[in-house]
A protein has these predicted regions:
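ATPase/helicase motor core of nucleic-acid motors
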Residues: 97, 284-287, 342-343, 369-508, ...
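Conserved P-loop NTPase-based nucleic-acid remodeling module centered on helicase motor cores
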Residues: 55-151, 276-280, 727-728, 743-747
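Helicase P-loop NTPase motor core
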Residues: 35-38, 53, 287-291, 297-403, ...
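C-terminal accessory regions
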Residues: 462-465, 583, 615, 626-681, ...
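P-loop NTPase Walker
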Residues: 1-111, 198, 219-222, 231, ...
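Conserved helicase NTPase motor core
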Residues: 2, 7-18, 22-26, 37, ...
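Accessory C-terminal helicase-associated subdomains
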Residues: 181, 200, 372, 468-593, ...
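Conserved helicase core region in the C-terminal RecA-like lobe
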Residues: 90-100, 232-235, 260, 565-617, ...
Length: 964
């Protein structure tokens, strides 16, 4: 181990870094340098043991954690001068890694090309739209309950995901004696059939399909075991049964599996996680085989804060019937550091209501006037839920008194003025809405009051203002048209949305100045979210234009179902992964949200809480007879375990000052509750003379350096064509209006990819005309079903001809193919460069790059500008291939599949100087994007005719850059 490692790591960290043979359990207490240890262990494997990137698998809890790990490892390797392409590693969440396995081996799964991936809302909406299918099943209400259709779909989702995440054997369910479990079995069987019918996959089933792949295809498992030499898993205490089984399969005989976590911070039982995975990890191996390391030195918190949460855990009950459900550990500060003796754990309390909020406000002002607090973002409030009425009231009170609050998960999306005005605008544009929303004369939904009073009324009031007369003038003919629509329009709801953005009522939120405000452009982000919701709605309900035959139903579906369900469930607002504590704002976060973070000042609320039961009768039935393993933690005790772990996690986020706050309430539900009361009142009051923030030092919030990915086609070309388009659709993440996809080109590409895949597998003899047509038809059926676009028979015949011509021309040279559809990436100093190469072929020590174009070969003179852009794209790919593989690229080609009889190639010689200029230009564009420079010298009018944001741009007051 090099001196650089030794000087930075403590004894236990070094032990964890250097132990690479066999299973390793790292129990990492809060603030103990867990991420540092993970980074150094990866670097050690690469530099000292010469492990190749494709031999490493690293699982993180979030994609953000994966990006942070990639960034930190690449920076360390750069420090010591080691070139290594980290993106060859299997690194990411369980879901992303399993998805990669499925895509790499899709032919061995039930999945077909172009499958749909559901998020949680998509999954529930899918079930909601089919709830009547489930109501036909015997005893379905034992699973779904007897609530509304939406409530039943929510219950159904919960139980279906539990079956999947617990890896419960469907055959065991099918043979159940309990009526509830029989009903669940029928629901599960139906759901799996529906997923297969729609070629869909939800998040839980990503892992189930991956497990099924590994268990049913020994050749796939053997290949992965032979490839993956070292496995590392972060946050192991929050893994579930199916994830544990996947790891057990992948680790193979060498068992070089390193798991890292803290059983005291296991928070995700409600998502299927089980603490038994980390507590029983050593038992998976022969006695003495698993090497345990405990990281217990806390580099984050003041010793008094550490002592407070140590005592909190020591007071919990962790042993039941002789079995212990916690690793014994005591967190301690570094021995060689000096700390001040001022109180660092204090309380804020006052009677419930305004008095408590005033007291919290006074405390914050004391911190501010102390002169030691440099930014409000050094303060974070942590609660069980930020949707709680007391929490929402406190946030509003503080904002009204000049303290900005950042609370992206408080579900205030539908309370924001810009969202309410948008909904009001849509109601205004469809005068029939008050009548068509009713399914009978006496019908009423609670959300109609929100629409009428909170959305329509304020929008109507805005229209009375002189500055909004252009908006009224634009709307009036549309109101008339929509009220008596006789012919299909040439737009849908999303088209109206982008028209609305041209008016100052909404455009004011999109200017560069608004995005630099304290709230970091929250309103603009909310408008972007609304565009995504409309896009999703139109896709789910097959809407491409407003059609008089379906308009009334579309309005009911949008307002009575889609928006209502989103309103009831709540929508989080924008969160920037690279800035978890925005400057100028006090953070209001859930404890779960704060996991893994740290703040100089942490104020923990929700002290009126107590342990609460989190399981149902059906949970108990499944636990005691149907799970793959016997019960572990006693169900009756889980509420206490979870309660102690939750607040331990909260308390341990604090660096310099930990504050406990509670309103005071008597009666049968006292606040603070009995679980906190003694500890709470034993703390010094913040008004005590002993509390002297003037004498304290508050750290600054740590910056997070996350490298972002950039590709030539998705980023550089878009930015160069129009920086304003880039700002909208990439930076602010607006969703463009759905247009008919280029089905022809995609179909040709996918079928050629099928050909290459078989050839690379050594089965070129299978590439017959009949087989190619079979692949082609299967691809077309899947594409057409997903995109809801169909091709005429003559067009289909032409597309098949493109593929057949390619096969006939190239079949004698299949042996030159080395790789196909290669997603390649390169971690650079400032960003990650990515690309996707259609084909890499080679001979005599060099390789050539081929990019397919499903069109006729263009006129080389007339299309010179377009061909030059393609050449730059190929040069980026050549740079990626050479840097990633070390192979020399000799030539680059465009292959035009539509060329009937002539040469289908347009070829470019590789020139190192030209490539260097292209990469330098790429770097310059990325630098502009990274610093938020979207200025233009003029509008690129050739891009405007079909652009969704043209109405906005036509009315924008431009500030063009001066040409050099």
């Amino acid at each position: 181990m090099t001196t650089a490692y030794a000087s930075r790591a403590n004894k236990k960290q070094r032990e964890a870094i250097l132990h690479t043979d066999g299973p390793l359990l790292i129990i990492a207490g809060p603030g103990s340098g867990k991420t540092f240890t993970l980074v150094e262990r990866v670097v050690y494997l690469i530099t000292e043991l010469h492990v190749a990137p494709e031999e490493l698998l690293v699982v993180t809890f979030t994609e953000k954690a994966a990006r942070e790990l990639i960034t930190r490892v690449s920076n360390r390797l750069n420090e010591i001068g080691v070139r290594f392409n980290l993106n060859e590693m299997y690194i990411g969440t369980f879901h992303s890694i399993c998805l990669r396995l499925l895509e790499d081996h899709r032919e061995f799964t039930r999945l077909k090309r172009n499958f749909t991936l559901f998020d949680e809302f998509d999954q529930q909406y899918f079930l909601y739209q089919r709830i009547w299918d489930y109501r036909k099943l015997p005893d379905y209400e034992l699973v779904t309950g007897d609530g509304s259709s939406w409530a039943q779909s929510e219950e159904l989702l919960k139980w279906l995901n539990k079956v999947t995440e617990e890896a419960i054997d469907p055959m065991v369910l099918a043979g159940a004696r309990d009526r509830e479990v029989q009903a669940l079995s029928w629901c599960h069987t139906l759901y799996q059939m529906q997923l297969e019918e729609h070629n869909a996959l939800d998040f839980a089933n990503i892992q189930a399909e991956a497990l099924r792949l590994l268990e049913s295809r020994p050749e796939v498992l053997a290949k992965l075991r032979g490839q993956l030499k070292y496995l590392m898993v972060d946050e192991y205490q929050d893994t579930n049964t199916i994830q544990e089984r996947i790891l057990s399969l992948l680790m193979g005989e060498a068992r070089n599996l390193c798991v890292v976590g803290d059983d005291d911070q296991g928070l995700y039982r409600f998502r299927g996680a089980t603490i038994r995975n980390i507590l029983e990890f050593p038992l998976k191996f022969p006695a003495g085989r698993c090497h345990p390391v405990t990281l217990s030195i806390n580099y984050r918190s003041h010793p008094d804060i550490i002592d407070f949460y140590n005592r909190w855990m020591a007071d919990g009950t962790w042993e039941v019937n002789g079995q212990r459900f916690r690793y014994a550990k005591t967190i301690k500060p570094p021995e060689d550091e000096d700390f001040h003796a001022l109180p660092t754990v204090v309380r804020i309390n006052a009677p419930i209501g305004d008095a408590w909020m005033e007291e919290v406000h006074a405390f914050l002002l004391r911190l501010q006037t102390s002169g030691q607090l440099s930014d409000w973002n050094q303060v974070a409030f942590l609660f069980r839920s930020v949707k709680n009425g007391h929490v929402v009231a406190l946030a509003k009170y503080l904002e009204q008194h000049g303290i900005p609050i950042y609370s992206p998960r408080s579900n205030q999306f539908f309370d924001r003025e810009e969202v309410r005005l948008l909904i009001g605008a849509f109601i205004f544009l469809f005068p029939q809405f008050p009548e068509v929303r009713k399914w009978d004369a006496n019908a009423h939904l609670d959300i109609w009051d929100y629409y009428d009073e909170n959305c329509f009324r304020p929008f109507a009031e805005q229209l009375r203002k002189p500055e909004n007369r252009p908006l009224l003038a634009w709307a009036q003919p549309l109101i008339k048209r929509h009220g008596t629509l006789a012919q299909p329009a040439d737009y849908a709801f999303s088209g109206l949305f982008y028209q609305l953005l041209q008016f100052p009522l909404f455009a004011q939120h999109l200017e560069e100045e608004a995005l630099r405000g304290v709230d970091k452009g929250r309103a603009a982000r909310n408008l972007a979210t609304f565009s995504t919701l409309l896009n999703k709605f139109e896709y789910l309900h097959h809407i491409s234009v407003l059609n008089p035959a379906y308009l009334d139903k579309n309005l009911r579906d949008l307002f009575n179902q889609f928006l209502r369900f989103l309103y009831d469930g709540g929508i989080g607002e924008y969160e920037d992964d690279s800035e978890y504590a925005p400057s100028g704002c006090v953070s209001f976060l859930t404890i779960h949200q704060a996991k893994g973070l740290e703040f100089p000042v942490v104020v923990v609320g929700s002290l009126e809480a107590g342990p609460r039961k989190q399981y149902t009768d059906l949970d108990a039935i499944l636990e005691n007879g149907y799970l793959a393993k016997p019960p572990f933690e006693p169900l009756d005790y889980t509420k206490y375990f979870d309660f102690w772990r939750l607040f331990y996690t909260a308390f341990s986020r604090a660096q310099n000052l930990l504050v406990l706050t509670s309103f005071e309430r008597g009666g049968t539900q006292p606040a603070p509750s009995k679980y906190f009361s003694d500890r709470f009142y034993a703390l010094p009051d913040w008004r005590s003379p002993a509390f002297q923030p003037e004498q304290m030092t508050f750290e600054r919030v740590k910056a997070i350096n996350l490298k972002r990915e950039y590709s030539f086609t998705s980023h550089i070309t878009l930015f160069e064509n129009c920086a304003e388009q880039y700002r909208f659709f990439k930076e602010l993440e607006f969703t463009p209006i759905r247009v008919s996809p280029m089905l022809f080109g995609t179909l040709v590409h996918q079928t050629i990819e099928d050909v290459h895949k078989i050839v690379l597998r050594g089965e070129a003899h299978r590439v017959t005309a009949k087989q190619v047509e079979t692949w082609f038809q299967a691809n077309y059926q899947n594409l057409a079903k997903k995109e809801r676009v169909y091709l005429a028979p003559t067009t289909l015949k032409a597309a098949l001809g493109h593929v057949m011509r390619y096969v006939q021309r190239e079949s004698s040279r299949w042996d030159r193919i080395q790789e196909a559809e290669v997603d390649i990436s390169l971690v650079k100093d400032e960003y990650i460069l990515t690309g996707s190469v259609d084909l890499i072929r080679g001979e005599r020590g060099t390789v050539e790059i081929v990019d397919f174009k499903s069109e006729k070969k263009p006129d080389l003179e007339k299309e010179r500008e377009r061909l030059q852009r393609y050449q730059r794209q190929l040069e980026v790919y050549a740079h990626l291939v050479e840097e990633r593989t070390g192979q020399r690229v000799s030539r680059m080609h465009l292959y035009y599949t539509g060329e009937d009889s002539g040469n289908p190639y347009v070829s470019f010689e590789k020139n190192d100087k030209t490539i260097a200029r292209t990469i330098a230009g790429f770097d310059a564009v990325v630098h502009r994007i990274e610093r938020g420079d979207y200025g233009m010298v003029a509008r690129p009018h050739k891009m405007c005719p079909d652009c969704d944001i043209r109405p906005y741009c036509d009315n924008k007051t431009w500030k063009f850059k001066q040409t050099p």
